[in-house]
Amino acid sequence: MNIPQEVARRRTFAIISHPDAGKTTLTEKLLLFAGAIQIAGSVKARKASRHASSDWMEIEKQRGISVASSVMQMEYRDCVINLLDTPGHQDFSEDTYRVLTAVDAALMVIDAANGVEPQTIRLLQVCRARNTPIITFINKLDREVREPLELLSEIEGHLGMDTVPFSWPVGMGKAFGGVFDIRRNRMRIFRAGQERRGEDDEFIDGLDNPEIPRRFGAAFAQASGEIELINEAAPAFDREAFLAGKQTPVFFGSAINNFGVQEVLDALVDQAPAPGPRQALEREVRPDEPKFTGVVFKVQANMDPAHRDRVAFVRVSSGRFERGMRLKVARTGKEMRPNNVVSFLSQRRELLDEAYASDVIGIPNHGVLQLGDVLTEGESLRFTGLPFFAPELFQAVEVKDPLRTKQLRVGLTQLGEEGAIQVFRPEAAGGALLLGAVGQLQFEVVAHRLKTEYGVDARMMPSRYTSARWITSDDPRALRKFMDANAAHIAYDVVDAAAFLITSPAQLRVAEDLYPNVKFHALREHGGKVFGDKA
């Protein structure tokens, strides 16, 4: 099959939600319906079934949250679907942002009892900023939940886009009878069961079929009135408006009971976009170009703790990847020929022979690749839009056993390169390493991973710093003068970019006034010292 045909088959999306909305459950059920797993949580492997929950890191298993990001690929209806699972805790917006730069659509999961929650709003803001098309799944209809019209109004208020229901619930909780497919004009009858795949589902055709009110009484009377209101007042689905981020199709169901999953999977194939062009500083890169390009959007350490490995997650931007092909790392100009390239189903890996635009490949990485690196067949390209945000929280870190100092530095270097934490090395001699984060849980995760993956018992200590700004200047002497005068507040991150550590907003304002030739940046792009606007 040629490159344009393969590109047209691809669908790459992420699931976004607030913790406990059912994201992990829906992830497993999508894999189940696509045939990638036999039962929820078990991979269909050649020799044996293996656990394949997307929550695979040890701390995730203990706490029931997604901290790392997993990649899963499945085939369904002659389409190749790449699912990127995002961190599900409110502290992990930066890592989640990096994942959302690698997808072409998002599936938003909402708990029907709680509505649109804070974490979902933050993720929606990222999607809206990128005009990412969003499909909405309102989950847990088998429980007592809020009125569906109220939920739609709330979604529209937070999203700033029209909702277009593709299905509508008949009843809720113990009275949940099923969902009415508005576009196909039929009702799918609800039956509980965690292993059912829909082959034996019962349908009743027609909103005016007397069988539905006979069986579902008052629940259907309310639902039918709401459906008529939707048909009269709601906007018709417009795929162009959806692709532009102006409409979201809405589905209702119960992921734990495999109900409504089929419709969502079909919508991903029928409505979600194939890979589109990606913008580099030099030019626009189209997915069907003959030559390969790809971007490292994540580096994950210790996916296999037994081997202390690091894997670079690369989204293919164009062309065809072949195992063993000669590639150039645009940042360094160095060549590499990756042979042990893998695809993923959560922690399980398989050797990969080829990949196309929007596929995610894993390249074993021993420090050669960094976040934001661009791989090409020789062209020098710099893709945009993969930033580090200035940390909002800081802690100093020391090792309890001085003999483990080297292991501490190795661990923090690897965790910093994968983006799990930001690590700053003070310019002043003898200063403790500083960790910067956007959420408190990141410190707990790093301490846990240092202990379990690197054998380092680290001590976290409060820091006086409240933020940081990366510093640059067109005048090297002006920059050096500023750094010398503020040596106690200067540190370097994992790519040796200089940063000014701040104790208060007033300190930053004074520095900006005294040193007008120095630029203070609230973000920097991965893979190089390309900085955003002053903030």
UniProtKB/Swiss-Prot annotation:
Protein name: Peptide chain release factor 3
Location of this chain's protein in the cell: Cytoplasm
Organism ancestry: Bacteria, Pseudomonadati, Pseudomonadota, Betaproteobacteria, Burkholderiales
Keyword Ligase carried by entry: no
Any one GO biological process: regulation of translational termination
Organism: Bordetella parapertussis (strain 12822 / ATCC BAA-587 / NCTC 13253)
Record's keyword annotation contains GTP-binding: yes
CDD domains the UniProt entry points to: RF3
Domain tr-type G span(s) in chain numbering: 8-278
Alphabetized InterPro entries for the sequence: EF-G-like_DII, EFG_III/V, G_TR_CS, P-loop_NTPase, PrfC, RF3_C, RF3_dom_3_sf, RF3_GTP-bd
Keywords: Cytoplasm, GTP-binding, Nucleotide-binding, Protein biosynthesis
One Pfam family matching this protein: GTP_EFTU
Positions of GTP binding: 17-24, 85-89, 139-142
Similarity field: Belongs to the TRAFAC class translation factor GTPase superfamily. Classic translation factor GTPase family. PrfC subfamily.
Function: Increases the formation of ribosomal termination complexes and stimulates activities of RF-1 and RF-2. It binds guanine nucleotides and has strong preference for UGA stop codons. It may interact directly with the ribosome. The stimulation of RF-1 and RF-2 is significantly reduced by GTP and GDP, but not by GMP.
Gene Ontology CC entries for this record: cytosol
GO MF annotation terms: GTP binding; GTPase activity; translation release factor activity, codon nonspecific; translation release factor activity, codon specific
